């Protein structure tokens, strides 16, 4: 059986780890352009 709850948590954790730096970079670029 596949444990979807664990898979969901791993995907969510990975998404947060990727989204964090991406948001920081986007904010830095927007501040740099202003």
UniProtKB/Swiss-Prot annotation:
One of its GO terms (cellular component) is chloroplast thylakoid membrane. Keywords: Chloroplast, Membrane, Photosynthesis, Photosystem II, Plastid, Thylakoid, Transmembrane, Transmembrane helix. Its main location: plastid. It is a single-pass membrane protein. Pfam families: PSII_Ycf12. One of its GO terms (biological process) is photosynthesis. The chain crosses the membrane at residues 6-26. InterPro entries: PSII_Ycf12_core-subunit. It is found in: Plastid, Chloroplast thylakoid membrane. Belongs to the Psb30/Ycf12 family. PSII is composed of 1 copy each of membrane proteins PsbA, PsbB, PsbC, PsbD, PsbE, PsbF, PsbH, PsbI, PsbJ, PsbK, PsbL, PsbM, PsbT, PsbX, PsbY, PsbZ, Psb30/Ycf12, peripheral proteins of the oxygen-evolving complex and a large number of cofactors. It forms dimeric complexes. A core subunit of photosystem II (PSII), probably helps stabilize the reaction center. This is Photosystem II reaction center protein Psb30. It comes from Trieres chinensis.
């Amino acid at each position: 059986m596949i444990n979807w709850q664990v898979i969901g948590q791993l995907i969510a954790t990975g998404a947060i780890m990727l989204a964090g730096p991406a948001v920081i970079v986007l904010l830095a670029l927007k501040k740099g352009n202003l």
